[in-house]
């Protein structure tokens, strides 16, 4: 297992971040993942990192803070936190987040407090988030197990067995087998995603129509100059990186006011430390006018109330139902993995790279091209075995994009 973990750490730094010699790496990790964070730091130095800067998190202390701290703690942006994120982002440092959290860390926390905390955090990270969404620096999110998360995924196993099983599952999603060829497999995978992306870009769809047996009946208009993206992103300096390990998606941005109908989530969503189930949105002219859920509805409504843009959509992503992650049969209770098992949408901020020349546009120019703006970006999964997506071109042709949950192009 140690060799597999070293290979995974190297994959993250070399393919995920494409770390350059002399570049600073900001590594954000839960304290429970310290052993793996150390492997990532060593891999970074092996590739010539100038410095590795650690930013530790802890679910227990996070929950204690949300339950017991005074209101001012969630309402006052801190200059030192703003400086930490802004200074390194402006320097072009690479950013790695090891994604591992208890899906129910913040269960029972007041939704109003969650919204206040997100607004304050967004104020502290404004420059960082803007540059990240525009691929201003290499960034990558990759997972590692912690006990509470593993127990949720494998509730019938002992804690140790659950953690081991989650490690095995994670390594399979990122194509790490221990043979030393994970990087080569990823180059092939990125080439496949790129080919599909180029086919979609050549078709220049005007809109997409989603239907399935859950009740989804949604039409999504796309900006005239939209671009599909997949797998490999690129900084303004031309440095390629893979923002999510794993990734199976091809994505673009919708026209902000061009979505109408009903969409139903196919999988639970973990958001702000709570689980939300059976999401159902009613959408008119791009805006979510009604949000329902069988569990966590208060958390869901808080999430779409962060700002006005949170009630509009920022991402349309295509993932085949027979993707390796969905085929594993596991529900990860973690968006990094579950979004790569299913077609998904996101409410909130759109990625500038999804419009021609978007990374160089001002906020006003992005608005004029129909891209949504928000402090938040939350993916939720809509793909099912019977999902049908029909694309309409600008000359009126209707083409099957998805049939029975998989690509039909």
Report residues per predicted region:
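Active-site bordering "gate/hinge" segments
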Residues: 1-260, 391, 397-400, 407-409
